[in-house]
Amino acid sequence: MSKILIKVQDKEKNFQSAHVVIIKDGNVLIVKRSDTDQWMPNHYGLPGGKLESGENPLDAASRECKEEVNLSVSPKDLIFLPKVSKEKQHAFYFTTKFSGEPKLDFEHSDFQWINPKDLSKYKVVPDLPEIISAALESLQ
């Protein structure tokens, strides 16, 4: 299995947020945005969020996983998804290496480990199917 590792410079790409496709036993972790969220309430998406001042996308992705779903993910275990990040202001990564069990914060009301084939059964944020597909393709 060959993986594409790309060093991402947030100044170069000007990413504003970072998100992670977390894969376990072929299933993907999705989180449901709370009903009070301003953008896409009650829709499923990925753990992630905005970069803090001076933060790079890898560190932001790792931090957001811990804050939002209580999973520890080392930045060195995150694989960049250039296909879906290329022309967006959002950096997308995937990983199969994490520790802990999901526990939600106030921003989310549910989480599911789903078979990617079942994604159409959920109300999801835009581009989520393509992002998950890109992550799964990168695993092969």
Give the label of every model feature segment.
Residues H19, N27, D110:
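Conserved beta-strand and immediately adjacent loop positions that scaffold enzyme active sites
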